[in-house]
């Protein structure tokens, strides 16, 4: 089954919370591209991972360092299994076959989506493991993990644990798998957001009616200027070539283009399959050193 990547339609970071996390506001979309993962119970009760690394060459070693070929104790799947088993010793062991395409440090939720796939599997095997307990556990593992437990798209606030499912029109896009490594903690620190109590937040916890309508109707060009990613100025200052890439996405026919997460991956949404194919070919011709993939949602 697919362990899908996510993209962010807009990512606002209004302030840093007193608990050390940053408050976020973003629309999270699951896309059709991602990792392939197969999980089965292991009779010996242990954790086994067998992975095939298909991440772009420049970032391939980042995954291998935490795979079964490196230090497995730093792998999010292993951490998820150990944490779940500590709460529910009755859980079975697992044997996981993973084709890894989503790179670390890409803003696509590659670790979080795998963790959610494993939690959903364990939940199906453990009748006394309630959905509320799974959600709490997911939030402890990673801020993006709760989103991947669901099936749909969501407006996400808090540190990532407050989810409001939303309706989004079917659409297509192109994803650029870029080689730049963006350390999430470093990117947040570079934003230099003011410290503030979460309780003092008075607005911004809901999408405007205008944005809800745009998302339902799939008018992606109307998102430009209405949804933005606060990490883009920092990312483009560190890596000006990413700003050039965004300009070309828009020049070549993308209706809306943005960095996803804290970077470094970038995507463009298009109006229809014909424009999607034309955009893909022009980007591949302009940036022959980069990897581009089609996706839909």
From Swiss-Prot:
GO terms for biological process: isopentenyl diphosphate biosynthetic process, methylerythritol 4-phosphate pathway; terpenoid biosynthetic process. One of its GO terms (molecular function) is ATP binding. Pfam families: GHMP_kinases_C, GHMP_kinases_N. Keywords: ATP-binding, Isoprene biosynthesis, Kinase, Nucleotide-binding, Transferase. It catalyses: 4-CDP-2-C-methyl-D-erythritol + ATP = 4-CDP-2-C-methyl-D-erythritol 2-phosphate + ADP + H(+). Belongs to the GHMP kinase family. IspE subfamily. This is 4-diphosphocytidyl-2-C-methyl-D-erythritol kinase. The gene is ispE.
């Amino acid at each position: 089954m697919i362990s899908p990547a996510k993209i962010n339609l807009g990512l606002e970071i209004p302030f840093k919370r007193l608990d050390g996390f940053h408050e976020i506001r973003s629309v999270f979309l699951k896309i059709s591209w991602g990792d392939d993962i197969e999980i089965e119970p292991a009779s010996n009760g242990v954790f086994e991972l067998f992975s095939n690394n298909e991440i772009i060459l420049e970032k391939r070693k980042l995954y291998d360092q935490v795979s079964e070929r490196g230090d497995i104790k730093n792998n999010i799947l292993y951490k998820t299994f150990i944490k779940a088993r500590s709460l529910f010793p009755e859980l079975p062991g697992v044997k996981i076959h993973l084709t890894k395409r989503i790179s670390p440090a890409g803003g696509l939720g590659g670790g979080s989506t795998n963790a959610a796939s494993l939690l959903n599997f364990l939940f199906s095997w453990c009748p006394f493991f309630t959905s509320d307990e799974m959600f709490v556990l997911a939030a402890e593992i990673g801020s993006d993990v709760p989103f991947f437990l669901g099936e749909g798209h969501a407006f996400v606030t808090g540190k990532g644990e407050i989810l409001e499912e939303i309706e989004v029109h079917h659409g297509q896009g192109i994803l650029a798998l870029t080689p730049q490594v963006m350390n999430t903690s470093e990117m947040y620190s570079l934003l230099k957001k003011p410290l503030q109590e979460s309780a003092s937040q008075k607005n911004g916890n809901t999408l405007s009616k205008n944005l809800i309508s745009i998302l339902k109707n799939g008018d992606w060009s109307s998102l430009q200027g209405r949804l933005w990613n606060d990490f883009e100025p920092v990312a483009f200052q560190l890596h000006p070539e990413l700003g050039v890439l965004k300009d070309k996405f828009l020049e070549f026919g993308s209706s809306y283009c943005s960095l996803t997460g804290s970077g470094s991956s970038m995507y463009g949404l298009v109006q229809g399959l014909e424009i999607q194919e034309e955009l893909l070919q022009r980007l591949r011709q302009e940036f022959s050193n980069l990897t581009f993939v089609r996706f839909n949602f």
